[in-house]
């Protein structure tokens, strides 16, 4: 592509992230020209839906969310569907009380250590930017550490809180959305033992064995632990793994439908690239394949990708997930 053509795609995306040097401008332009039409159509429908003031839980809303929440409505919709808005309304002033509470040097140091590692490719998080979102990120993570002392701060939460801040542009709303994720939607993912995270990685393994037996057999033959391949997918909720717009579309559904969405995404990535994965002959090889499957046009074209996650894995109810979690958790606890 000629330099003049390259400049048609801004080097910084709408969220403040610098596009990498190897960014495929041509593929992105082709995708976005059609996606823009979809976005415009969805924005009109959402504006109509929200005229009444509320965001009722209904089949219509579920369908709308799966087709994507427009950026201008995203914070409001996430807040309502996740229960974060209700929590914030019931606890006025609580967030600011947490920030003014007793100091915890260990917590503060742990958070500070990760600030510069959080989105170095995002201009909004650079110290040279005014205002710099690092301070906002620090406040949200500090308040959450005081609020949920059983978790405190865990690596991965910085990336999640960072995305929440970019979408809400509001500290307090970001705090309550983080609480919805860490406290309710993904319980025990970020606790010291990370039992919820370990359990869900095992659940994914069981789902792969049932739905994609050839991949399951390869994993067993090579003796690969799922944690080696997907721990960052789960703990970062695909942040810094999949393209920004795709992650946000996943989160639209995550806040509305819960954690089974993570399994749908993981299963779709694996199923779509099953042939590539089955070429692996060693542990390093399969690790490399799992990095490859999170790149390219399949994940960039977020609208098609989201349609796939609701068709490719087949039926996947919360009841099925709950049953698998129960057996996997029991197995992990028995192993000590």
From Swiss-Prot:
Q: GO cellular component annotations, sorted alphabetically?
A: cytoplasm; plasma membrane
Gene3D superfamilies xref list: putative rabgap domain of human tbc1 domain family member 14 like domains, Ypt/Rab-GAP domain of gyp1p, domain 1, Ypt/Rab-GAP domain of gyp1p, domain 3
Keywords associated with the record: GTPase activation
Any one Pfam family here would be: RabGAP-TBC
Superkingdom is Eukaryota
Q: Where does the record place the Rab-GAP TBC domain? A: 68-258
Matching SMART domains = TBC
Provide a Gene Ontology MF annotation, just one: GTPase activator activity
**What role does this protein play?**
May act as a GTPase-activating protein for Rab family protein(s).
Q: What protein am I looking at? A: Growth hormone-regulated TBC protein 1
From what organism does this protein derive? Homo sapiens
